[in-house]
């Protein structure tokens, strides 16, 4: 039987770069929150040990796709620990709604959903901590999606502290460009020395994103999108872009602004969620097993 699993988007409500390690990775402080909008992963268990991706992505080999990599990672970890069932395998499809290179965490969210869903469907019995550790090998943002709760992240994004920021309404806009993360992080003008602050201090300050100045300088459409949004509400870049978002207290206020969006700017309205749709789904599945 085909099962459906949410793969939600995330926003970085703030993002500050606090340094750069000897290995090149940047240290940061960021606040992750989920929204009630994203991709949908479809999974039908198989009995023959095969992993099939039903919806390949253009220009990405199936074996390089994060969905397939996540499934194979779980197979290997389960086999190594004696938790792999005798009959396993899966047909996996994805209905994409999140843009690639948009800063919404689409690929990381897909990987996390596959780890969580297959662990449940195959009965592997990995804990959330174990799945998060596996997920970190796929990408720095995967653990927060596995854990499924809004979080303050430090280090290179792997040190997570659960938090509960206000669940506002957001107008999230895609300016029609894709920004590879290295383009931003390799820019020599990227701020890399923002002072480390406590979460208590950060929550009292106006939120910002150190990557925004670079994205606006290098991508004209990102600059134009933010300039337009800032006329209506507090707005900023999410992640390294390219998506930008504005925050509102009500859904109707967000939708009124979306209706006025220029033709070249595509967007949607979503509610902030401190417990992700994936976490809600797995809790419901566990409760009614």
Curated annotation (Swiss-Prot):
Superkingdom, taxonomy of origin: Bacteria
Chemical reaction(s) catalysed: 4-CDP-2-C-methyl-D-erythritol + ATP = 4-CDP-2-C-methyl-D-erythritol 2-phosphate + ADP + H(+)
Disulphide connectivity of cysteines: none
Keyword Nucleotide-binding: yes
Known EC number: 2.7.1.148
GO molecular function: 4-(cytidine 5'-diphospho)-2-C-methyl-D-erythritol kinase activity; ATP binding
Gene that encodes it: ispE
Pathway participation: Isoprenoid biosynthesis; isopentenyl diphosphate biosynthesis via DXP pathway; isopentenyl diphosphate from 1-deoxy-D-xylulose 5-phosphate: step 3/6
Stretch forming the signal peptide: none
Active site: 10, 141
InterPro entries recorded: GHMP_kinase_C_dom, GHMP_kinase_C_sf, GHMP_kinase_N_dom, IspE, Ribosomal_Su5_D2-typ_SF, Ribsml_uS5_D2-typ_fold_subgr
Single biological process term from Gene Ontology: isopentenyl diphosphate biosynthetic process, methylerythritol 4-phosphate pathway
Binding site for ATP: 99-109
Function recorded in the entry: Catalyzes the phosphorylation of the position 2 hydroxy group of 4-diphosphocytidyl-2C-methyl-D-erythritol.
Enzyme class label: transferase
Species in which this protein is naturally found: Enterobacter sp. (strain 638)
Family: Belongs to the GHMP kinase family. IspE subfamily.
UniProt keywords, alphabetically: ATP-binding, Isoprene biosynthesis, Kinase, Nucleotide-binding, Transferase
Listed name of the protein: 4-diphosphocytidyl-2-C-methyl-D-erythritol kinase
Keyword Kinase: yes
Assembly information from the UniProt record: Homodimer.
């Amino acid at each position: 039987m085909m099962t459906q699993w949410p793969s939600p988007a995330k926003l970085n409500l703030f993002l500050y770069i606090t340094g750069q390690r000897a290995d090149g990775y940047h240290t940061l402080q960021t606040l992750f929150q989920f929204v009630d909008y994203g991709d949908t992963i479809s999974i039908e268990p198989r009995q023959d040990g095969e992993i099939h991706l039903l919806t390949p992505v253009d220009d990405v080999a199936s074996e390089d796709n994060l969905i397939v990599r996540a499934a194979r990672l779980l197979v290997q970890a389960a086999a190594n620990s004696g938790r792999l069932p005798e009959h396993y395998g899966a047909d996996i499809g994805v209905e994409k709604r999140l843009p690639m290179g948009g800063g919404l965490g689409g690929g990381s969210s897909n990987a996390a959903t596959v780890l969580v869903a297959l662990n449940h469907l195959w009965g592997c019995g990995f804990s959330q901590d174990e799945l998060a550790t596996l997920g970190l090998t796929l990408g720095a943002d995967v653990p927060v999606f596995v854990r499924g709760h809004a979080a303050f992240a430090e280090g290179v994004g792997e040190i997570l502290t659960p938090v509960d920021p206000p669940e506002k309404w957001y107008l999230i806009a895609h300016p029609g460009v894709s920004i590879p993360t290295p383009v931003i992080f390799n820019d020599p003008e990227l701020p890399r020395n923002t002072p480390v602050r406590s979460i208590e201090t950060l929550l009292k300050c106006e939120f910002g994103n150190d990557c925004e100045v670079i994205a606006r300088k290098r991508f004209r459409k990102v600059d134009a999108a933010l300039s337009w949004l800032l006329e209506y509400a507090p707005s900023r870049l999410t992640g390294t872009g390219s998506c930008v978002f504005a925050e509102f207290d009500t859904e109707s206020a967000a939708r009124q602004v979306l209706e006025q969006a220029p033709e070249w700017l595509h967007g949607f309205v979503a509610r902030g969620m401190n417990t992700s749709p994936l976490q809600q789904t797995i809790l419901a599945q566990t409760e009614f097993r």
